[in-house]
UniProtKB/Swiss-Prot annotation:
<dbReference type="InterPro" id="IPR018038">
    <property type="entry name" value="Ribosomal_uL30_CS"/>
</dbReference>
<comment type="subunit">
    <text>Part of the 50S ribosomal subunit.</text>
</comment>
<dbReference type="Pfam" id="PF00327">
    <property type="entry name" value="Ribosomal_L30"/>
</dbReference>
<keyword id="KW-0689">Ribosomal protein</keyword>
<dbReference type="GO" id="GO:0022625">
    <property type="term" value="C:cytosolic large ribosomal subunit"/>
</dbReference>
<dbReference type="GO" id="GO:0003735">
    <property type="term" value="F:structural constituent of ribosome"/>
</dbReference>
<comment type="similarity">
    <text>Belongs to the universal ribosomal protein uL30 family.</text>
</comment>
<keyword id="KW-0687">Ribonucleoprotein</keyword>
<dbReference type="InterPro" id="IPR036919">
    <property type="entry name" value="Ribo_uL30_ferredoxin-like_sf"/>
</dbReference>
<protein>
    <recommendedName>
        <fullName>Large ribosomal subunit protein uL30</fullName>
    </recommendedName>
</protein>
<dbReference type="GO" id="GO:0006412">
    <property type="term" value="P:translation"/>
</dbReference>
<dbReference type="InterPro" id="IPR016082">
    <property type="entry name" value="Ribosomal_uL30_ferredoxin-like"/>
</dbReference>
<dbReference type="InterPro" id="IPR005996">
    <property type="entry name" value="Ribosomal_uL30_bac-type"/>
</dbReference>
Length: 60
């Protein structure tokens, strides 16, 4: 299965609590931190919820 790299580009400060919890659940802490996750429906849904805070790119 493909993998994706998720990078936190904007701060979750001032966002609604569910968006802040989603950022933490993705494993992102500080700005510009990145994680590599499996590309599946659950992760894609989380990315959609915070798409204005993160950038996503595919990893080969």
């Amino acid at each position: 299965m493909a993998q994706i790299k998720i990078t936190l580009t904007k701060s979750p400060i001032g966002r609604i609590p569910s968006q802040r919890k989603t950022v933490v659940a993705l494993g992102l802490g500080k700005l510009n931190s990145s994680v590599i996750k499996e590309d599946n429906a659950a992760i894609r849904g989380m990315i959609t919820a915070v798409s204005h805070l993160v950038t996503v790119e595919e990893v080969n």
